[in-house]
């Protein structure tokens, strides 16, 4: 069955999630999107493709990833003895985050298309690292675009990318949105190098078929977690919680629970947006809460707009969530009510970062810390037994130096008694950004 990608275009697969999605791109890109969609459809029908993908998941990425129950967190209120928090350990995937799930899938498609060069945008550097990783694995050239502010706060990942042979280009953030600006520049590169280049978009946004194939490759997260929770607890989780920027890790964590399977309808799906300095300020990255619909980076979805209807700056302590838009399926899930979307502030995320590090010996990515922050809040408010599954989308090694500057003397104090309530993220970023390596 074909479906319109715009009011007049036809695609092999459904290009929309309700009213969200589509292919709102320059006409020159449409043949490349069609080519990618055909390759994806053909790959799904080719058993050798799935065999190669599964082999790489197992023997290169190290899947399946385990589930760890938090055993020592000093839960507050009713949560003590009532709530159980489980972590889906995507931080243990080779590369340090969930991103490798789909970079391997897209790189295999690029190989089928005869492409020799991969380009990508990155915020926290995790997607850039995963792209550089698969480019090295498959012997392909690689260029990664990254906002100058993000280059400054994610130096370990910048070095990792270059170590694996990638060219890292610091992007002038004219719009104030590092990740958004990096996507703009990457799309421009793709337009000018379609013959040999595949744009390995890093999130579940962008023009069709990117949201669909990114979800497919990341759905391995929830396929595993559903089976693991049944085996571990004898039941599905009461709630699955994941952070949401563009939304790739969350859509992967939700995917299997969206299928028509017994018990799925009872599982709450909760996406946590970066509330930054607060949802009542303009210093956040929460388009589902604060945004309106617009065409951004090739698809129709929610985005942060100013009073004049122009894209406005986003803000988050975590570079990977500092994006003014969100993937179209998340917009649809919000509208239908199948998923809930909440916010966690910079301070709440940093507090969760400290708690998991101090009490469980697991240093989470700042992105994942937003999801953990909401899980801790749910646990504190629980009045009856509840099993909460948090998608720990990445590890926090990349954030340690940055967090050290943010926390100062708080780093050595017990977070259970020294509760962080505010933090001067913008002040630290202003000090960091001039040091960005723009080579």
From Swiss-Prot:
Pfam families registered for this protein in UniProt: PALP
| Naturally occurring in which organism (per UniProt) | Corynebacterium efficiens (strain DSM 44549 / YS-314 / AJ 12310 / JCM 11189 / NBRC 100395)
Say what the protein does.
The beta subunit is responsible for the synthesis of L-tryptophan from indole and L-serine.
Give coiled-coil spans as residue ranges.
none
Protein name (Swiss-Prot/TrEMBL): Tryptophan synthase beta chain 2
Q: Which cofactors does it use?
A: pyridoxal 5'-phosphate
Q: Which residues carry this modification: N6-(pyridoxal phosphate)lysine?
A: 99
Give the highest taxon in the source lineage.
Bacteria
- InterPro entries in the record: Trp_synth_b_CS, Trp_synth_beta, Trp_synth_beta/beta-like, TrpB-like_PALP, TrpB-like_PALP_sf
Report which reactions are catalysed by this protein: (1S,2R)-1-C-(indol-3-yl)glycerol 3-phosphate + L-serine = D-glyceraldehyde 3-phosphate + L-tryptophan + H2O
Q: How does it assemble?
A: Tetramer of two alpha and two beta chains.
Which keywords does this Swiss-Prot/TrEMBL entry list?
Amino-acid biosynthesis, Aromatic amino acid biosynthesis, Lyase, Pyridoxal phosphate, Tryptophan biosynthesis
């Amino acid at each position: 069955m074909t479906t319109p990608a715009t009011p007049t275009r036809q695609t092999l697969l459904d290009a929309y999630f309700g009213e969200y999605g589509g292919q709102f791109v320059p006409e020159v890109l449409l043949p490349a999107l069609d080519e990618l969609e055909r390759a994806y459809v053909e790959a799904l029908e080719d058993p050798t493709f799935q065999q190669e993908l599964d082999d790489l998941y197992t023997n290169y990425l190290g899947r399946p990833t385990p589930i760890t129950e938090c055993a020592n967190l000093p839960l507050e209120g009713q949560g003590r003895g009532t709530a159980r928090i489980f972590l889906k350990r995507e931080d243990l995937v080779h590369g340090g985050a969930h991103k490798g799930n789909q970079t391997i899938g897209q790189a295999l498609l690029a190989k089928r298309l005869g492409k020799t060069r991969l380009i990508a945008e990155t915020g926290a550097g995790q997607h850039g690292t995963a792209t550089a990783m698969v480019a090295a694995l498959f012997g392909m050239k690689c260029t990664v675009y990254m906002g100058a502010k993000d280059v400054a706060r994610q130096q370990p990942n910048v070095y990792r990318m270059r170590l694996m042979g990638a060219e890292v280009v610091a992007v002038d953030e004219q719009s104030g949105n590092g990740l958004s600006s990096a996507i703009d520049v990457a799309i421009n590169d793709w337009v000018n190098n379609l013959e040999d280049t595949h744009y390995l978009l890093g999130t579940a946004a962008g023009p069709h078929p990117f949201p669909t194939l990114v979800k497919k490759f990341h759905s391995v997260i929830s396929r595993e977690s559903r089976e693991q929770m049944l085996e571990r607890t004898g039941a599905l989780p009461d709630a699955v919680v994941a952070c949401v920027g563009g939304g790739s890790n969350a859509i992967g964590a939700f995917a299997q629970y969206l299928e028509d399977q017994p018990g799925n309808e009872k599982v709450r799906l909760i996406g946590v947006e970066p509330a930054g300095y607060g949802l009542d300020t303009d210093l956040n990255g929460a388009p589902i809460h604060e945004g309106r619909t617009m065409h951004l980076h090739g698809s129709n979805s929610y985005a942060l707009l100013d009073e004049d209807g122009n894209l406005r700056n986003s803000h988050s302590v975590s570079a990977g969530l500092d994006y003014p838009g969100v993937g179209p399926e998340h917009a649809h899930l919000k509208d239908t009510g199948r998923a809930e979307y909440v916010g966690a502030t910079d301070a709440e995320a940093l507090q969760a970062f400290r708690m998991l590090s101090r009490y469980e010996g697991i240093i989470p990515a700042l992105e994942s810390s937003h999801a953990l922050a909401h899980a801790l809040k749910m646990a504190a408010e629980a009045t009856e037994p509840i099993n909460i599954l948090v998608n720990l989308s990445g590890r926090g090694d990349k954030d340690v130096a940055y967090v050290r500057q943010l926390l100062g003397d708080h780093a050595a104090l017990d977070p259970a008694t020294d509760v962080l309530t505010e933090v001067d993220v913008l002040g630290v970023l202003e000090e960091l950004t001039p040091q960005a390596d723009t080579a």
